[in-house]
Amino acid sequence: MEIQSGPQPGSPGRAERLNARLLDEFVSLHGPTLRASGVPERLWGRLLHKLEHEVFDAGEMFGIMQVEEVEEAEDEAAREAQRKQPNPGGELCYKVIVTSESGVRADDPNSIFLIDHAWTCRVEHARKQLQQVPGLLHRMANLMGIEFHGEVPSPEVVALVLEEMWKFNQTYQLAHGTAEEKVPVWYIMDEFGSRIQHSDMPSFATAPFFYMPQQVAYTLLWPLRDLDTGEEVTRDFAYGEADPLIRKCMLLPWAPADMLDLSFSTPEPPAKYYQAILEENKEKLPLAISPVARPQGHVFRVHCDVQQVLGHLTHPRFTFTDSEADADIFFHFSHFKDYMKLSQESPQVLLNQFPCENLLTVKDCLASIARRAGGPEGPPWLPRTFNLRTELPQFVSYFQHRERRGEDNHWICKPWNLARSLDTHVTNNLHSIIRHRESTPKVVSKYIESPVLFLREDVGNVKFDIRYIVLLRSVRPLRLFAYDVFWLRFSNRPFALDDLDDYEKHFTVMNYDPDVVLKQVHYNEFIPQFEKQYPEFPWSDVQAEIFKAFTELFQVACAKPPPMGLCDYPSSRAMYAIDLMLNWDNHPDGKRVMQPQILEVNFNPDCERACRYHPSFFNDVFSTLFLDETDNCHVTRII
């Protein structure tokens, strides 16, 4: 690395040695991030200086130019409507240009600039911050060109800012911390950074940067070529994407485009797609083995790191061991990877996982394999789902088709592989969905706009979801059981298709937030209440439809050889939690029906409530999976 300094006689002085040491420490801490962002090493020395001393010198090199084309409105009503729009007054455009008489040189070590962040938040907190943080709404409205009068936050202005923010938002996420702390953060650059416009041939690059010593996030700006006075500073809003069609979709928030001519069909991906997932997961498939017979009454030694199992498995046929070498059963919380080694060295060891079970438990894979049952649009028991990484153009086309037909267009964005509704967002804003693609890998699913509701006497008609525990004994032959007890989760506020960021209205997971009320209704209390509210729908009939959906799901998941389907490994067993809702639908004959909608399949689910209210839960699970004894267990065979 070159360290720029003037000529010095003799050996380096103390200050230079100190600077060199500080730079080494800086590179040790931040070098990987800077390299990943493409920041040239020649700029690192001055970057450190500017970070240490909080040097914001972009104003010495650049200026903001405003271009406005005013069109006469036809009448006062039209002018008033125009004033309420973002960027009132016609085509209002800002540009950042080089104002330094000497221009900007890409090889100048000083050609890196800090951009401050005007607003940083997580999406679920945005509305509250706009309403409560002094001056924030006013600043954001001004930055976005939204007219704002008075001091009291107007709901209309708040709504406009929340809609327009997706044209200005950038994102990063922390690499370390809890699952909650790693949820992506969205930020809006200051007035200078937010005025930098898009170009497919950008003159500058930007990257978010978290300076750890001061725990402050900035955006770094540096030139990609030399610029003369008056030239525009631009960046690529779809940086890193080469595919022209994907770029067109990514740029829709700023460059509207009609995608109606594009097919929104999403057939199941080819075999190589699943092979790539297998390799990315570093999962090694097992060799073929024969089931190992054990003597009558054999006591199984269980190596387990799941606390709920350790605390509640009391069946006399199972005992715990700390030694993996002595174990008959591995019941592990983390995902197992090297099935090949296990099949070679310990084929007799049973375990609580199947090779390739991510096809069920990861949301994009679940949507892909489900198309085997329902074709490109998916089966009736899974909401229409698109993988935003691989199916963005199809989704945009589908969204625009629904919009043109006047159909409901509420969607829910979910990370591929997070539970507890983390980083999950309900929206009808296409720009928001497109931009969410830039954070973590996500799917977008049709939001259930007509859910079957449950009347809570203390609240009103609320959303609810149902969790079933299913036990997969084997793939070939396919043997699947459901635990007889199911669990219910309820929203805390009456359902309506508004206030889409109101967690307690649109979500049901309440047991992880100590400040939120958890409504507890046991299954045996729920069934008579449900049948009283919906006398035409006996619960036995509803559950039969639910089990029919489970049957189809596992049939398609096991229909193809790995990595396109679950692997038939004789030593594998598994317990999954399936979360679902009920949706009102109409059959072709006009009959109104409750259609189960599978939301997700969870590996190693939290069974705290099961253990608390049903002490025999894990005894039943282990008897079913490992002993093939179900007569005295609370399970029902589905397949």
UniProtKB/Swiss-Prot annotation:
Coiled coil segments of this chain: none
The TTL domain, residue ranges: 295-639
Tissues where the protein occurs: Widely expressed with highest levels in brain, kidney, liver, lung, muscle and testis.
Record localization: Cytoplasm; Midbody; Cytoplasm, Cytoskeleton, Microtubule organizing center, Centrosome; Cytoplasm, Cytoskeleton, Spindle
Keyword Magnesium: no
GO cellular component, one term: cytosol
Molecular-function annotations in GO: acid-amino acid ligase activity; ATP binding; catalytic activity, acting on a protein; histone H4K20me2 reader activity
Binding site for ATP: 445-448, 463, 465
Keywords noted in UniProt: ATP-binding, Cytoplasm, Cytoskeleton, Immunity, Innate immunity, Nucleotide-binding, Nucleus
S-S bridge residues: none
UniProt xrefs under Pfam families: TTL (PF03133)
Domain of life: Eukaryota
Gene Ontology biological process: innate immune response; negative regulation of type I interferon-mediated signaling pathway; protein modification process; regulation of mitotic cell cycle
Keyword Ubl conjugation: no
Function summary: Negatively regulates post-translational modifications of tubulin, including detyrosination of the C-terminus and polyglutamylation of glutamate residues. Also, indirectly promotes histone H4 trimethylation at 'Lys-20' (H4K20me3). Probably by controlling tubulin and/or histone H4 post-translational modifications, plays a role in mitosis and in maintaining chromosome number stability. During RNA virus-mediated infection, acts as a negative regulator of the RIG-I pathway by preventing MAVS binding to TBK1 and IKBKE.
Record's subunit section: Interacts with MAVS; the interaction prevents MAVS binding to TBK1 and IKBKE. Interacts (via N-terminus) with TBK1 (via protein kinase domain). Interacts (via TTL domain) with IKBKE (via protein kinase domain). Interacts with tubulin alpha. Interacts with histone H3 and histone H4 (when trimethylated at 'Lys-20' (H4K20me3)). Interacts with CBX3.
Homology family: Belongs to the tubulin--tyrosine ligase family.
The protein's name in its UniProt record: Tubulin--tyrosine ligase-like protein 12
Gene: Ttll12
